């Protein structure tokens, strides 16, 4: 049973980004008792625009998930985590950490940033084969951070994954937030 969902924003936004609000709203509209919390990274709370180093971001994910699970009186394996772009990537890295693996019920990656735009040689996927939680990837077919072919290839070693491709959408998924929220809510309820 899923007790809650913890959501993290992309690098250039915060927890009040419209996409995270749409996900929260869609989950609440399922009429389940699934809790949702949107979490800001520490650099945003401090008013900085440039992200902290990866280990700091991963630790923020881990601490937020542990805190949410404690407040909901459940184990972390009853919690789905994820986020948009960098937020989803940091969640995937927390799950894949071989020394402090975070056991969760599922992972949602909206606009997974497989590589920087126009730099396909700089893949951010080495850890993905270690992600064992059920994973939902939602990406646009025109996402400049990774093509359909690139992301499909990078995630091929993962056993329990699902891809949803939004035709014509770029990394911003412009005007698709409600659709994305509904897709995620449906997937979370199905776990």
Question: Which functions belong to the PLM regions below?
Answer:
Residues 34-37, 157-172:
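Catalytic histidine neighborhood in serine/cysteine hydrolases
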Residues 20, 124, 133, 147-154:
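Short alpha-helix in the alpha/beta-hydrolase fold that links the catalytic acid
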Residues 141-161:
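Conserved loop-alpha-helix segment in the C-terminal half of the alpha/beta-hydrolase fold
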Residues 13, 141-146, 171-172:
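Acidic catalytic loop of the alpha/beta-hydrolase fold
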Residues 130-132, 137-139, 143:
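Short beta-strand/loop motif that positions the catalytic acidic residue
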Residues 169-181:
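Catalytic histidine-centered segment of alpha/beta-hydrolase-like enzymes
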Residues 61-133:
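Primarily recognizes the serine-hydrolase "nucleophile elbow" in alpha/beta-hydrolase
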Residues 2-78, 89, 93:
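Serine-hydrolase catalytic machinery in alpha/beta-hydrolase-like enzymes
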């Amino acid at each position: 049973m899923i007790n809650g969902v913890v959501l993290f924003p992309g690098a250039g936004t915060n927890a009040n980004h419209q996409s995270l609000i749409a996900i929260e709203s869609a989950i609440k509209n399922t009429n389940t008792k699934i809790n949702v919390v949107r979490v800001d990274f520490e650099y945003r709370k401090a008013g900085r625009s440039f992200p902290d180093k990866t280990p700091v971001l991963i630790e923020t994910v881990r601490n937020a998930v542990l805190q949410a699970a404690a407040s909901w009186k459940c184990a972390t394996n009853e919690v789905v985590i994820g986020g948009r772009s960098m937020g989803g990537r940091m969640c995937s890295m927390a799950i894949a950490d071989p020394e402090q693996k975070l056991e969760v019920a599922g992972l949602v990656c909206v606009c997974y940033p497989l590589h920087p735009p126009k730099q396909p040689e700089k893949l951010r996927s080495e850890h993905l084969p270690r992600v064992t939680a059920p994973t939902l990837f939602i990406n646009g077919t025109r996402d400049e951070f990774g093509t359909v072919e690139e992301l499909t290839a990078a995630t091929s070693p993962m056993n329990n994954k699902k891809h949803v491709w939004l035709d014509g959408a770029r990394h911003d998924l412009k005007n698709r937030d409600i659709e994305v929220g509904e897709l995620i809510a449906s997937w979370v309820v199905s776990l």
